[in-house]
Curated annotation (Swiss-Prot):
InterPro entries: aa-tRNA-synth_II/BPL/LPL (IPR045864), BPL_LPL_catalytic (IPR004143), Octanoyltransferase (IPR000544), Octanoyltransferase_CS (IPR020605)
Gene3D superfamilies for this protein: Bira Bifunctional Protein, Domain 2 (3.30.930.10)
Reaction equation(s) it catalyzes: octanoyl-[ACP] + L-lysyl-[protein] = N(6)-octanoyl-L-lysyl-[protein] + holo-[ACP] + H(+)
Protein name in the entry: Probable octanoyltransferase
GO biological process, any: protein modification process
Protein's cellular compartments: Cytoplasm
Organism: Pyrobaculum aerophilum (strain ATCC 51768 / DSM 7523 / JCM 9630 / CIP 104966 / NBRC 100827 / IM2)
Record function comment: Catalyzes the transfer of endogenously produced octanoic acid from octanoyl-acyl-carrier-protein onto the lipoyl domains of lipoate-dependent enzymes. Lipoyl-ACP can also act as a substrate although octanoyl-ACP is likely to be the physiological substrate.
Family note: Belongs to the LipB family.
Residues bound to substrate: 66-73, 130-132, 143-145
Pfam families associated with the record: LplA-B_cat (PF21948)
Keywords: Acyltransferase, Cytoplasm, Transferase
Length: 224
């Protein structure tokens, strides 16, 4: 699985690249790839989510294809978007993502795990990583966001995945110093290994046709 760090991005920009690569993987034009990024402030709401879980409309809000509810992305958060042709049951794939995050956090001395009845990765009763996946044409995309240095108070804009914002925690809050890029790339590497794939760092995206589709933010009136 190729792994590409694309730096800090606007969400719609990263989404379009992800969609283009998804189409290319589905058509056999390129192989499995994981994009690693850090977003400018944004809220996304999954296909089963509710807009009333968005509390504060001061950043762009997008409705997207992934599962899950509302989540916030921003600086200080490592986001990994694996674009992978599925040859495993979906549950096995999502478990592999969680396991990759748990093992990555373990290298920093953080004891993380899973929580019965909830997806994502947890430290006790606090959530440190959120997962949302979409599958089309048997190719999975979207992925996982790991809170590295992000201030958990940023999540007060939403009820994250229907949970109170106070549920969220970061590596920094746990006293761990880490770089967003390093955490994201290590997670992608560990995911490749969990899936029996060979991780390969690349410096630029494969040349594939770009989708014409553009993601537009939700437009609502904001009360003063």
């Amino acid at each position: 699985m190729k792994i590409l760090w694309i730096g800090r991005t606007q969400y719609a920009e990263a989404w379009r690249l992800m969609k283009s690569l998804h189409c290319a993987v589905a058509q056999g034009l390129t192989g499995d790839i994981a994009l690693v990024t850090e977003h400018e402030p944004v809220v996304t709401v999954g296909k089963h989510g509710r807009l009333n879980n968005v509390i504060k409309w001061d950043v762009p809000v997008y409705l997207v294809e992934r599962g899950g509810d509302a989540t916030y992305h921003g600086p200080g958060q490592a986001v990994v978007y694996p674009i992978v042709a599925l040859r495993w049951p979906l549950k096995r794939y999502i478990d592999a993502i969680e396991d990759a995050v748990i093992k990555t956090l373990g290298t920093y001395g953080i004891l993380a795990g899973k929580k019965q009845g909830h997806r994502g990765v947890w430290v006790g009763d606090r959530k440190i990583a959120s997962i949302g996946i979409a599958v089309e044409n048997n190719v999975a995309y979207h992925g996982v966001a790991i809170n590295v240095t992000i201030d958990p108070r940023e999540f007060a804009r939403i009820n994250p995945c229907g949970l109170p914002a106070s549920t969220m925690i970061s590596m920094k809050e746990l006293g761990v110093v880490a770089e967003v890029r390093d955490v994201g790339i290590e997670t992608a590497k560990k995911l490749a290994l969990e899936l029996g794939l060979t991780p390969e760092l690349i410096s630029k995206p494969p040349e594939v046709p770009q989708v014409a589709e553009e993601l537009k933010p939700v437009r609502v009136a904001i009360n003063a």
